């Protein structure tokens, strides 16, 4: 191991901040030599001992990664356009987060090192959560991230920060991008800290690919009442709330290769790299039959615990934890800056086929082409769009949704500048962003959640918003963090709602053509300029697929495959199951207990709550019902009344969106966010109006775009039945006159 590598990593760990940072809140931490309590085994963990473990881990990382690069250097490069490249695009770690990632990974490994050497007990993980980092070499970094008293000084707190910081004025880090997902239940790791349980590789918890093949069918299963807009709004909102990244090499910043280019094991018969958790493909797999035995999966990027302690591994959310439009504007100041014109509050646009910005209102506007990052587009620079979230390009109609909201921002910015000609670029941008964010929140709670969970359920379970006046729902003690179970095991239900066939519709909702999702995955640029309006009508007309275990092969066999170059792709169900294991998500039965649902005590109990025919299939793969994983159980669960999901999934979704609202100081219906006239206008917003105002030339739309329309439901976009907001209520002169 070269000394230069050692110095590089150790400097990265230790020189995060100067030794004494004046803005840090040291009063939060106890100042005793033994750290925390005076009882139990961790009494003896003095700072020197903790730092010894940290140093040992750093040396182990240097040795491990140096040896890995020496042995497999020829196989570490990732082919541009490959399925692995496609996955890395969706899950890539932002450059500015690299240092945080390295710290979190070392703390995670040091936690296990302490447990192994100091207390080989099965309760050690919970004990170590009481041991603070503050006096160790990692302390300054964690304190600066979570307990920096000066973090909000100098910020314009009238508007949201790009990264979600300073929403909570007492805990500036709360809900911030780069912080950890929240645990609803204690994580399930085999060593209590970071390892996937060994039983996942035994006979009763087989490879995720075996489960995918056993459970998933590619059959048409349309929902008779809901449109494809349900699927894409789910994904759109999911990307606003969560973004999990894949770990990379901590010294070279290169991807960790788990599989050979030929997609066999890179290191057969031996332990994978610490950051690898490749999906094993069985020999008898009928699709991957041509020597494909390995599906790439890199472990998720860890996060530093918000209480600055050692303990079990947590995963980082790169997105802000708030419903704040971060998929449009980005989750960092840097990303937001890359999307702005810095003129008249506008977001950057392009003509769709080149990257020239234009101001001609008669020409359709598209998001700017991504030509700055060579690896950001699967098919090369300039073949995808730049958005607040890098995942905007995978699904054509998701790209449409991003385009509509980019246009909505610019439309509002233009109107605001007209009624307030004295406003500068920054004021126009922030006010337009504020209206866009409020509109997304209103559509999510007033239209999408009732359609997903059922109107009666949302009404009687704390999810219905007031239709008049202000709410008093904000609670500064509520944690806004997106739950790990929601992001990892529940949100993937949206993938089952997709179809390989993308139907294109005329103005009168007649299908005149169709496209294949497989042929256009990650290839959005030419598609939008040719089919924008047909795709918008498709969102509001084509039936979404039911939420179940039926998935298109585009996602289970051909995911990220560059058609027709690559014969095989990846499997989204296998990857999602593997991610739940990587994150230590407890079982389906444990979450039924959490939700207060009836416990499963027999095969008969299981049969009553699962869809017909699924119980035998489940117990053929799992030893018993206690081993069924949350993602699998939730997708097989019977739906309730007018809900699109089962009771366990509904419970976890409800828990998330109650906190998402209560913990947001900027939620749109709180006092001092909008005046009473403006709030009335926000409550008029519908997704139908967004489709009407921001398509190229759609002239008819149903008022409720999440519901399948009859011809009688279609209204002219100019109709008062699809109301418009009156931007004059944002004129400062008008407000002054009324007062």
Where are these regions (language model features)?
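A positional/structural detector of protein chain ends, strongest at the extreme C-terminus
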Residues: 1-4, 738-739
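Secondary-structure-rich domain cores
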Residues: 409-411
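Terminal regions of secretory-pathway proteins
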Residues: 18-396, 414, 419-739
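A generic structural signal for short
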Residues: 2, 401, 576-577
């Amino acid at each position: 191991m070269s000394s230069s590598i050692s110095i590089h990593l150790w400097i990265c760990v230790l020189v995060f901040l100067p030794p004494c940072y004046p803005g840090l809140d040291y009063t939060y931490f106890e100042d005793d030599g033994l750290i925390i309590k005076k009882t139990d085994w961790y009494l003896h963990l003095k700072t020197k001992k903790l730092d010894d473990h940290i140093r040992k881990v750093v040396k182990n990382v240097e040795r491990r990664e140096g040896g890995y690069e020496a042995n497999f250097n020829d196989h570490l490069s990732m082919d541009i356009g490959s399925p692995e490249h496609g996955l890395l695009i969706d899950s890539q770690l932002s450059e500015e987060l690299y240092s945080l990632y390295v710290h979190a990974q070392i703390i995670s490994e040091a936690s296990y090192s302490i447990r192994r050497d100091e207390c080989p007990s099965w309760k050690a993980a919970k004990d170590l959560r009481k041991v603070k980092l503050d006096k160790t070499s990692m302390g300054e970094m964690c304190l600066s991230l979570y307990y920096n008293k000066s973090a909000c000084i100098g910020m314009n707190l009238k508007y949201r920060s790009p990264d979600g910081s300073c929403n909570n004025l007492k805990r500036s880090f709360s809900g911030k991008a780069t912080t950890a997902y929240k645990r609803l239940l204690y994580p399930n790791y085999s060593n209590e800290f970071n390892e996937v349980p060994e039983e996942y590789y035994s006979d009763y918890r087989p490879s995720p690919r075996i489960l995918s093949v056993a459970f998933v069918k590619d059959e048409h299963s349309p929902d008779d009442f809901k449109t494809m807009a349900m699927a894409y709004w789910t994904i759109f909102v999911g990307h606003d709330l969560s973004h999990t990244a894949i770990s990379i090499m901590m010294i070279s910043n290169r991807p960790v290769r788990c599989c050979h280019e030929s997609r066999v094991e890179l290191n057969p018969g031996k332990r994978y790299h610490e950051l690898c958790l490749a999906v094993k493909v069985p020999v008898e797999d009928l699709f991957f039959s041509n020597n494909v035995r390995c599906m790439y999966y890199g472990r998720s990027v860890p996060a530093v615990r918000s209480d600055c302690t050692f303990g079990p591994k947590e995963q980082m959310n790169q997105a802000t934890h708030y419903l704040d439009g971060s998929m449009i504007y980005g989750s960092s100041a840097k990303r937001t800056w890359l999307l702005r014109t810095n003129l008249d509050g506008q977001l950057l646009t392009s003509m769709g086929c080149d990257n020239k910005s234009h101001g001609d209102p008669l020409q359709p506007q598209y998001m700017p082409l991504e030509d700055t990052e060579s690896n950001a587009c699967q098919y090369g620079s300039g073949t995808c769009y730049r958005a607040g979230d890098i995942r905007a390009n995978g699904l054509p109609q998701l790209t449409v949704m991003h385009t509509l909201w980019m246009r909505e921002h610019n439309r509002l910015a233009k109107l605001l500048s007209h009624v307030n000609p004295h406003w500068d670029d920054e004021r126009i941008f922030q006010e337009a962003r504020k209206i866009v964010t409020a509109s997304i929140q209103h559509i999510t709670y007033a239209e999408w959640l009732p359609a997903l969970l059922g109107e009666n359920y949302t009404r009687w379970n704390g999810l219905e918003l007031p239709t008049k006046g202000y709410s008093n729902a904000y609670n500064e003690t509520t944690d806004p963090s997106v739950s790990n179970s929601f992001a990892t095991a529940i949100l993937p239900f949206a993938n089952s709602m997709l179809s390989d066939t993308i139907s294109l519709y005329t103005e009168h909702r007649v299908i005149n053509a169709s496209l294949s999702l497989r042929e256009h995955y990650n290839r959005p640029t030419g598609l939008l300029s040719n089919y924008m309006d047909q795709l918008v009508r498709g969102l509001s007309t084509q039936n979404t697929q039911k939420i179940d275990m039926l998935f298109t092969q585009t996602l289970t066999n051909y995911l990220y495959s560059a058609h027709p170059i690559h014969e095989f792709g990846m499997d989204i169900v296998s990857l999602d199951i593997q991610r739940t294991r990587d994150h230590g998500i407890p079982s389906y039965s444990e979450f039924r207990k959490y939700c207060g649902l009836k416990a499963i005590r027999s095969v008969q109990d299981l049969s009553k709550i699962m869809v017909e025919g699924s119980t035998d299939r489940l117990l053929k793969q799992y030893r018993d019902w206690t081993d069924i994983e949350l993602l699998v159980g939730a997708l097989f669960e019977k739906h309730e009344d007018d809900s699109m999901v089962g009771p366990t999934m509904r419970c976890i979704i409800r828990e998330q969106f109650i906190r998402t609202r209560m913990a947001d100081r900027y939620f749109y219906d709180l006092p001092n966010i909008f005046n009473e006239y403006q709030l009335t206008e926000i409550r008029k917003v519908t997704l139908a109006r967004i489709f009407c105002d921001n398509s190229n030339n759609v002239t008819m739309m149903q008022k409720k775009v999440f519901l399948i329309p009859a011809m009688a439901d279609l209204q002219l976009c100019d109709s008062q039945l699809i109301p418009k907001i009156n931007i004059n209520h944002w004129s400062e002169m008008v407000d002054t006159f009324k007062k």
